């Protein structure tokens, strides 16, 4: 069965790193207040079959809590055990290994950060670059799959 792993900030949630770096350190509830990109309801619908996971990097416990609130608001069909938070800078594939999840060719990661996608593919998964107006400028370095509209994700992983 295919498993779909989704990054949060900049991929599903409207997060502009250039405008947010100082705010999330001081503004309580910052991550919980982020808006969602168009098409989030299709992702929530996909999650009903239990094979959708959230894997988000977080700087601290307050942000962990905020992100869980965001997930509950927009992606309440994602099973609680599939809502995973690692630390900023962690290799997401390595983190999942510590949770007993092995990445293989049936594991897809949708992320806006090319480094995460490269690390994912190095262990046998399939990376999908999320294209947004604020996606990192390493897009030109990414040669794999891309998704601009969240509603098209189901087509890409079919």
Q: What is each stretch, according to the model?
A:
Residues 22-54, 61-65:
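Short, acidic loop-to-helix structural element flanking the phosphoryl-transfer center
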Residues 55-60, 68, 74-94:
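A short, structured active-site edge motif that brings together acidic residues
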Residues 94-102, 140-158:
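Short amphipathic alpha-helix with an adjacent loop that forms part of the alpha/beta core around
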Residues 2-16, 120:
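Asp-based phosphoryl-transfer active-site loop
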Residues 3, 85-115, 120:
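Conserved Lys-Pro-Asp/Glu-containing loop-to-beta segment of HAD-superfamily phosphomonoesterases
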Residues 7, 55-57, 110:
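Short hydrophobic segments within beta-strands
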Residues 104-146:
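Acidic, Mg2+-coordinating phosphoryl-transfer loop and its flanking beta/alpha structural elements
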